[in-house]
Design a protein with these regions (language model features):
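C-terminal catalytic subdomain
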Residues: 70-193
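Catalytic core of PPM/PP2C metal-dependent serine/threonine phosphatase domains
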Residues: 1-33, 61-81
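Short, well-ordered strand-loop elements centered on a beta-strand within folded domains, enriched
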Residues: 15-23, 36-43, 147-157
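Short, surface-exposed, charged loop/turn segments at secondary-structure junctions
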Residues: 35-48, 100-111
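Ser/Thr-centric signal marking residues that sit
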Residues: 3-6, 41, 90
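Short, catalytically relevant binding-site loops at active-site mouths
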Residues: 28-29, 46-47, 94-95
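Conserved, helical-rich catalytic subdomain that frames metal- and/or nucleotide-binding sites
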Residues: 38-86
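Short, solvent-exposed aromatic-acidic interface loops
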Residues: 25, 44-48, 158-164
């Protein structure tokens, strides 16, 4: 049975981290800092669609892990200033939301409502399970912050910004044109690395 993967190997350098992502298929690796969510990996799909367009077309994969035949693991190493989150996710975690902004918002809003890492994990799962049409795995590691309270405080402003700039303006009755305009505004930061 074919599968996809996203793996992050992280080295803590003090004020920064070196992160090497390994992936195959459409599982993704990200980092999230005060400037927002940034997709580091590139989906193995047959077209050159961006993250917004691929949510609508679910591009056909060109590389998956399987026991028979050829596949490859892609790799990319980047240095990231702390504090930051390193995130890996299968498409079941992000692929059933309307926009990449929604995925960032569920990560941050679930954090804002949590008093422990376990509670954050549960709240994030509670937001993903009702919308996903797939199994999912989301891994989050936080660097440069002491505890969940520090993490909430550090990302509070970003969560509010995403809510006011991208979530509240569309509500539940968003049309494609409006979503595309918001995506065009969000996209440069999302692909900044």
């Amino acid at each position: 049975m074919p599968t996809t993967a996203s793996i992050a190997a992280v080295k803590n350098n003090g004020s920064s981290i070196t992160c090497e992502f390994f992936w195959a298929g459409d599982s993704r690796g990200y980092f999230l800092d005060a400037d927002g969510l940034c997709q580091v990996t590139k989906d193995d799909i047959k077209t050159d669609e961006d993250a917004f367009t691929n949510l609508r077309s679910d591009g056909r994969m060109s590389n998956v892990i399987h026991a028979e035949g050829d596949f490859s693991l892609n790799t990319r190493e980047i240095e990231i200033s702390q504090p930051a989150m390193i995130i890996t996710s299968t498409d079941g975690g992000f692929g059933y939301y309307g926009t990449p902004m929604d995925f960032e918002y569920i990560i941050l809003s679930s954090l804002m409502e949590s008093d422990s890492p376990e509670e954050w994990e549960n709240k994030l799962s509670e937001l993903i399970i009702p919308v996903t049409g797939d199994d999912f795995a989301v891994g989050i590691a936080v660097y440069g912050l002491d505890d969940i309270a520090d993490c909430r405080e550090h990302f509070k402003e970003r969560c509010q910004f995403i809510k006011e700039s991208y979530i509240d303006p569309v509500g539940e009755n968003a049309d494609e044109e409006q979503l595309l305009r918001l995506w065009q505004k969000y996209k440069p930061g999302y692909y900044r690395r």
